[in-house]
C-alpha cells in the first residue's frame, strides 16, 4: 500500500518517537495559541507543564525538538520575545560556556579519572562505603567547583566502567574497538548487565544529590549562590557561616539517608556490583598497570597537574568557569599530543545537544518572566512576617524550584526581597535571614526533579542515561527519599528557630556583623 504524503510527514515528524507522543506535541501546538488568547497566565503555566512533559519523555525523544517547537511557538504568539530569550542566554552565558568547554575538558582527563575510580571500586567492596564515598566526595567538590563539572566527571567515569564491561562481556579484549551502546552480542548476560546498570544508577544518583548537599554550603557552589551573595554583600566565609544552621544538619541527614537507602535497599537502591563485573574491572586495572608505558604515565601526570589547576582556578575564581574549561582542553591536548581535529570533535559531542536544550529552556524562563507566573506566590509569601515568613519562603521557593530552574527562581526571589527591603517592608536583618531561606530553598527541594537542578537535567539527557535505563520517572523516584529528608530537615531548622538563634549567636560573639540598608542598595545588580 503506497504511503500518503500525510503519513510520510507523520513518520518523519520527531522520527522514531511513539505516535501518541507525536500527536500530543501537535495537540500542544494547536491548543497553546487558543489558551494564550483566552488567558495568558494559564497558557504560561500550561507551557511550563508541557515542557516538563517533554523532559519526562527524554528516553522516547530528546527534549530539544519537542521542547524547541513549543518555545518557538511561544515566541511567535507573543508569550515572550526574542530579545527576552537573548537576555536570558546572555545572563547565563557562563553556564553555556561551562557546558561547551568544561565537559569537553573533562573528556580529555578521563584516563586519570578512570584510573582513580577503578582503584576505588576494585579496592572497596562494601557498596554502602562506596555510595557514601561518592556522595561525600561529590558534596566536597561541589562546595568549591560547579555541580555540572562534578556530574560531568562522574558521568565520564560511569561511561568508562560501562564500556569496559560491555567490551569484555561481548568477547573482546581491552584494547579492541567496540560499540558499547549495542546489546546485540550473544555473550552478554542480561541479568548481570541489569545488575551493573543498577549499580551505576545508584552511584550516579548518590553523586547527583551530593552536588546539591555541597553546592548549597558556599557562595561558589551554585550560580544562584553567587547572585544571592552579591545582593547581600556577603563574602565566602560569611556566606558559609550564615548557611551553616541549615546546611550542616541537612548534610548529616543527607549522608544518613544515603546509608539507609543502601542498607535497606529501598527506592531502587542497594544494587550490588556483580562479582563477574568486579573481576573484569580488576583485570582491566591489572592489565592497564602492567601495560602502562612511560608515555602513558606522562599523560596521567599531565592530567593530574591540569586537575590541580582546575580545582585551584575554580575555587579561587581565577577566571570564569567556561574559560577555565577551555584552558583544560588546551593544556591536556597540547601536552598529551591530541592534535587531530576528529579527536577533538568527539569531546564536544556529549555537551552540545544539552547546551542547545538549555538555550530552549531559557526561552521558557522568558515566558515565566514576561507572564509573571511567579508573582502571586511572591506577594503571598511577603504577606507573612518573622519566622513564619522564612518558612513560607522556603516552602514556596522549594516548590517552584521543583518545576523551574533554581538559578532563575533564586534570582527572581532575591530581587523581590531586595525591592521589599528598599521599600521598607522588611528590616536588613530579616533580609539576611530571607536570603538564607531563598538559597536553601532553591538548592535542597530542587533535587526532586531534573527541572530544578541543571546537573540532574544534564545527567538525564547524557549518553549514560539510556545505557543504564535512567529515565525521568526513575530519577524522581530515586530522588524521593532525599527530597523528603532534605526538605523536611531544612524546614525544621528554620521552623524551630535554629536559623534565627544561631544567627543571633554569631552576632553576639562577633562572628557576624550587622549589615546596613545602604550595602544592599549599593550591591551589584543581578544579571537578571
Curated annotation (Swiss-Prot):
GO terms for molecular function: sodium:proton antiporter activity. It is found in: Cell inner membrane. Keywords: Antiport, Cell inner membrane, Cell membrane, Ion transport, Membrane, Sodium, Sodium transport, Transmembrane, Transmembrane helix, Transport. The chain crosses the membrane at residues 23-45, 66-86, 95-115, 139-159, 203-223, 241-261, 310-330, 349-369, 390-410, 448-468, 476-496. Signal peptide: none annotated. It is a multi-pass membrane protein. NCBIfam families: NhaB, PRK09547.1. Na(+)/H(+) antiporter that extrudes sodium in exchange for external protons. HAMAP family: NhaB. Belongs to the NhaB Na(+)/H(+) (TC 2.A.34) antiporter family. This is Na(+)/H(+) antiporter NhaB. The lineage of its organism: Bacteria, Pseudomonadati, Pseudomonadota, Gammaproteobacteria, Alteromonadales.
Amino acid at each position: 500500500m503506497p504511503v500518503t504524503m500525510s503519513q510520510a510527514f507523520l513518520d518523519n515528524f520527531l522520527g522514531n518517537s511513539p505516535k501518541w507522543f507525536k500527536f500530543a506535541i501537535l495537540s500542544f501546538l494547536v491548543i497553546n495559541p487558543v489558551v494564550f488568547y483566552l488567558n495568558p497566565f494559564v497558557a504560561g503555566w500550561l507551557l511550563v507543564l508541557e515542557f516538563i512533559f517533554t523532559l519526562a519523555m527524554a528516553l522516547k525523544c530528546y527534549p530539544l525538538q519537542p521542547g524547541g517547537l513549543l518555545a518557538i511557538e511561544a515566541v511567535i504568539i507573543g508569550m515572550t520575545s526574542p530579545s527576552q530569550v537573548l537576555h536570558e542566554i546572555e545572563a547565563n552565558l557562563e553556564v553555556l560556556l561551562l557546558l561547551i568547554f568544561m565537559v569537553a575538558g573533562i573528556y580529555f582527563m578521563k584516563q586519570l579519572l578512570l584510573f582513580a575510580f577503578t582503584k576505588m571500586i576494585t579496592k572497596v567492596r562494601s557498596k554502602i562505603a562506596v555510595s557514601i564515598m561518592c556522595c561525600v566526595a561529590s558534596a566536597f567538590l561541589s562546595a568549591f567547583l560547579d555541580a555540572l563539572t562534578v556530574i560531568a566527571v562522574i558521568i565520564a567515569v560511569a561511561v568508562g566502567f560501562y564500556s569496559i564491561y560491555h567490551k569484555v562481556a561481548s568477547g573482546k579484549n581491552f584494547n579492541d574497538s567496540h560499540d558499547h551502546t549495542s546489546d546485540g552480542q550473544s555473550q552478554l548476560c542480561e541479568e548481570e548487565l541489569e545488575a551493573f546498570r543498577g549499580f551505576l544508577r545508584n552511584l550516579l544518583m548518590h553523586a547527583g544529590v551530593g552536588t546539591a548537599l555541597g553546592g548549597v554550603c558556599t557562595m561558589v557552589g551554585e550560580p544562584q549562590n553567587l547572585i544571592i551573595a552579591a545582593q547581600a554583600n556577603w563574602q565566602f566565609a560569611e556566606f558559609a557561616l550564615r548557611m551553616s544552621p541549615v546546611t550542616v544538619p541537612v548534610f548529616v541527614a543527607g549522608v544518613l539517608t544515603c546509608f539507609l537507602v543502601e542498607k535497606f535497599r529501598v527506592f531502587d537502591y542497594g544494587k550490588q556490583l556483580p562479582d563477574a563485573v568486579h573481576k573484569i574491572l580488576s583485570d582491566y586495572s591489572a592489565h592497564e598497570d602492567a601495560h602502562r608505558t612511560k608515555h602513558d604515565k606522562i599523560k596521567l601526570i599531565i592530567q593530574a597537574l591540569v586537575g590541580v589547576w582546575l580545582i585551584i582556578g575554580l575555587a579561587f575564581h581565577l577566571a570564569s568557569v567556561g574559560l577555565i574549561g577551555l584552558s583544560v582542553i588546551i593544556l591536556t591536548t597540547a601536552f598529551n599530543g591530541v592534535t587531530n581535529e576528529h579527536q577533538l570533535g568527539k569531546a564536544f559531542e556529549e555537551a552540545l545537544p544539552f547546551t542547545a536544550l538549555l538555550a530552549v529552556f531559557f526561552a521558557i524562563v522568558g515566558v515565566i518572566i514576561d507572564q509573571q507566573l511567579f508573582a502571586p506566590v511572591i506577594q503571598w509569601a511577603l504577606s507573612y512576617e518573622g519566622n513564619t515568613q522564612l518558612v513560607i519562603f522556603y516552602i514556596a521557593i522549594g516548590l517552584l524550584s521543583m518545576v523551574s530552574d533554581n538559578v532563575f527562581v533564586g534570582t527572581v526571589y532575591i530581587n523581590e526581597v531586595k525591592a521589599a527591603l528598599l521599600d521598607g517592608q522588611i528590616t536588613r536583618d530579616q533580609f539576611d535571614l530571607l536570603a538564607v531561606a531563598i538559597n536553601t530553598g532553591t538548592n535542597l527541594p530542587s533535587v526532586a526533579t531534573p527541572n530544578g537542578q541543571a546537573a540532574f537535567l544534564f545527567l538525564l539527557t547524557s549518553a549514560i542515561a539510556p545505557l543504564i535505563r535512567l529515565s525521568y520517572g526513575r530519577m524522581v523516584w530515586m530522588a524521593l527519599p532525599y527530597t523528603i529528608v532534605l526538605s523536611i530537615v531544612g524546614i525544621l531548622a528554620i521552623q524551630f528557630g535554629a536559623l534565627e538563634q544561631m544567627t543571633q549567636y554569631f552576632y553576639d560573639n562577633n562572628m557576624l556583623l550587622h549589615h546596613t540598608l545602604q550595602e544592599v542598595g549599593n550591591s551589584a545588580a543581578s544579571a537578571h
